[in-house]
Every structure is written in C-alpha cells, then in structure tokens.
Amino acid sequence: MNRDNKQMLKTGKTGWLAAATGFVAMLVLAVVYLLSGGEAANPAEYVQGLPAAKEGAASSQNDDPILVFFTDPAYPDDPADHRDGLDEALAADIDRAQASVDVAAYDFDLESVADALVVAYRRGVRVRLVTDSDNAEELGARQLGSAGLPVVVDDRDAIMHDKFVVIDGRVVWTGSWNLTESGTYRNNNNVARIASDELAENYTAEFEEMFEEREFGPDSPADTPHRQVLVADGSEEIRIESYFAPEDRVADRLVELLAGAEDSIRFMAFSFTDDRLGDEMIRQHEAGLTVQGVFEGRNADPVYSEFGRMVEAQPRMDVRLDGNTYMMHHKVIIVDDKAVALGSFNFSEAADTVNDENLLIIYDRGIASLFRAEFRRIYREALEGRE
C-alpha cells in the first residue's frame, strides 16, 4: 500500500515517568540507557543519579548524549491509565527550551505536548510545526494554529511521515513514535533523544526545507550537512549516520548495511514490502547468518509483504507476526548486535521514493543491546500471539 497503511498509525501504549534534578526521564520496562559507562541503568539508580541540568535549558552540556525509550503497551487498554508516558517526558524537555522548538509530526493529538508548545511560544520561544494533510485537523495542529503558531501542511498524495522534534538547535527526538495517544499508550514504539549540535543541524536543515521552502518528497534536495556525526560519550565517541528520504537513497544504504552483516540480522517491521531489503535478508539467511524478524500482523499481506517470501524460504526463516492487540509500530534493524537502524522509515517503496522520512544508524553495542532486549520482548509476545 503506497501510503504505508497510514490509518493504522493511529492505534497504539507506554510506560512510566520519573522526574529528578530538573530533568524528566522516561523509564519504560526499566530500559533507559545512560551513556555513562555503557550499561543499562537500574530504574531506582537512574532516578537518583540523573545529572544536574542547567536551569531552564533543554540543551545543557550536562545532558546525557543519548537516551533511548520504548513504550510498554498494556492489555486491555484503559484510557484512565494514560499518564506518565513519553508525552510527559517530551513536554518536560519543551518546558526547558530557551530559543526554539521545531516539530515535524505526521500525526499529533497529544494535548500535553500541544500545551507545552503553546506555553513555550507564549514565553518567547520560536515554535514551528510541519504536519501532513491526513492529520491536519487533529488536536495538535488545531491547537497550535488557534494559538497563532505557524503550521505548514504537506498536502501531497504522498505523506510527510517524519516524527522528530528539535529543541534549541541542540537536542533531537526521533524514532517510530507518533505524537498520539495511541502511539504513546497502545503501540510498540521507540524514540531516541540525542544531544548533538551537528545532528540537530541536519534535522533543522530538513525541517527548513519543508517549512520555509515547501520542499517535500522528491523535491527535497540532498544536502544533509553532516552525513556522519560523532557523539561524545566520556572519553569515547559514538558514530551515527543520518539520512533523509527520498533524497538520500535510504533503502540502498540499508541494503549495504545488511550485506555487511557477519553474524546476525534482527528486525521489527510495521510495514515491510521492499523486495531489495527482503532479498538481502533472504540471501544472508541462506548464507548461514541468524536472521529473525517480527512483522506487524495487520500489514503482513500475502501478496505485498516480505513475510510470505521469508516463510517460504528454505530453510524457513525465523519470522513471526506480532502479538500486540493494537500495533507493533517499530521500524528497526539490528545488525551483529552492534549497529541499529531506526527512525520513521518503513521498509517500503513509498518510504524510499515519495514520503518524507528520516533514519539513523547508530553504531554502539550498548544501544544495540537495548534494542536486542526490546526485540526479545516483541518476539516473545509474537510467540504468545494476539489476545
């Protein structure tokens, strides 16, 4: 389906929130990663050990360089439990913004985030929104527009599918997470919060193309300032590759990443219809590598999805349909337990050729271990089946 089953993006659950030392951190499944020693933090230790943040500054130099969050859907869903989620963590970061907040959101109905953006705007922070025409009447765009904030809408047939926020030209939030109740409290999602001037410059440049120049999809120029960025982690540096679709030929880069795998490939896919990616995974499976995957069951169409081809591979590939009653919305590939591809980019032709998308490849075993743990959880739920 050309539009990546966009209607399914609106059904989705997440975890719990902890506040300390002026900064809010989301503790979902106790899987929050402080890049200070390279180990996942114990929840209690994490809350007690949060670094002191400069008063009112989202872009403090004391920020941990990378934080990774996962949602934690509960079944059955109870809207009364929709609190202490990713939305509140992001809203707290927005509350600390001093200069600017840019939001590119395919879908946006989180009142807590909309309220935080309006409050920031009223205290002098520049706040801008780019969204898609499919969801221009949702709460987020309506509330911001009513408050006088500038909103740009992509009204093409293809979609502006990004889900990123840039705060103070320093902090980037990006992943599979739509800014919606469902995305936060029902669907399986991930988001990374990365403090990096260079990465923020990349995302700001992409935002400016859409907001100022109205350049969407194939009209967007391939001019990302920093294809590769290094994020300081104490005495070490973490390498991150930064891509935007369709201008950066993202699927080609993913094929290269898969072709370079030496031991294992694991993936979680909301939509997976790209034959090139499927071909490379099947080839690596036949070459003896461990290849495992979980597909969103509602998108495992027998004609278009790669699921059918992988099930029919000889020997049969270890691929499953997800067990989330709502949506398994990840778009993640883990290679050799040391590299992770993540972002808004579904593994489809539409994502690669006409939609606006973003993707990061992070090279770090600690972060890969977190996504591997999330994969194990999603895989286990897939074995148990949908309720």
For the regions a language model picked out, list residue spans one by one:
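Charged, low-complexity intrinsically disordered terminal segments
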Residues: 2-152, 158-159, 166-387
